[in-house]
């Protein structure tokens, strides 16, 4: 596919742009390191099978190729800190169905709480929500890979 399926969602529903602007401010204070936000976004892109999200995160990353290449196998990779592992585990729990029980167990939350303050956990939750907001637009609207939403959907 060479062009998006939907040229500009905001022209059909202007509140889409307002919501996008609001959710994009979730980490504007820099509570979480940009590198962590990129790793989480990259993992979500991989989990939902979105070339757009995966390429976007890789394009914004200022990390080593080894770490970026190992995100899908973070559990067995030596490249990630315990805090990053906790964030990636939360990311997978939130974005992967669990037919046998709750997605975020008490044990998983407790592990994350060892590495993040309550504020950081709320911001991480917001980052996951921000990404979650854009997933349907990326999967249904099929934006061009390597081009930002804003750049291609300004019509």
Describe the function of each predicted region:
Residues 1-38, 58-62, 66, 145-155:
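Acidic, glycine/proline-rich low-complexity segments that act as flexible tails and inter-domain linkers
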Residues 2-11, 73-80, 90-97:
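A ubiquitous short alpha-helical element
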Residues 14-20, 49-51, 98-106:
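Short acidic alpha-helix initiation/capping motifs at coil-to-helix transition points
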Residues 37-60:
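Short, thiol/selenol-centered motifs that function as redox-active sites or metal-ligating centers
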Residues 39-44, 71-72, 87-95, 122-135:
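Short alpha-helical scaffolding segments that buttress acidic/His motifs in well-ordered protein cores
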Residues 57-91:
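Helix-adjacent hinge/juxtasegments
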Residues 79-127:
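Acidic/histidine-rich alpha-helical segments that form the ligand environment
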Residues 118-155:
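Preference for long, well-ordered alpha-helical segments
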């Amino acid at each position: 596919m060479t062009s998006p399926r939907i040229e500009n969602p905001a022209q059909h529903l202007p509140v889409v742009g307002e919501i996008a602007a609001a959710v994009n401010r979730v980490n504007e204070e820099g509570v979480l390191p940009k590198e962590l936000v990129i790793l989480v976004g990259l993992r979500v892109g991989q989990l939902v099978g979105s070339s757009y999200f995966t390429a976007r995160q890789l394009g914004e990353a200022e990390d080593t190729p080894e770490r970026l290449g190992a995100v899908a196998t973070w559990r067995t990779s030596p490249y990630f800190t315990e805090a990053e592992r906790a964030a990636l585990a939360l990311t997978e729990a939130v974005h992967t169905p669990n037919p046998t029980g709750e997605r975020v167990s008490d044990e998983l939350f407790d592990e994350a709480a060892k590495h993040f303050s309550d504020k950081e956990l709320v911001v991480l939750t917001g980052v996951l929500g921000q990404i979650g907001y854009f997933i349907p637009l990326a999967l249904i609207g099929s934006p061009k890979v390597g081009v930002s939403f804003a750049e291609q959907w300004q019509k």
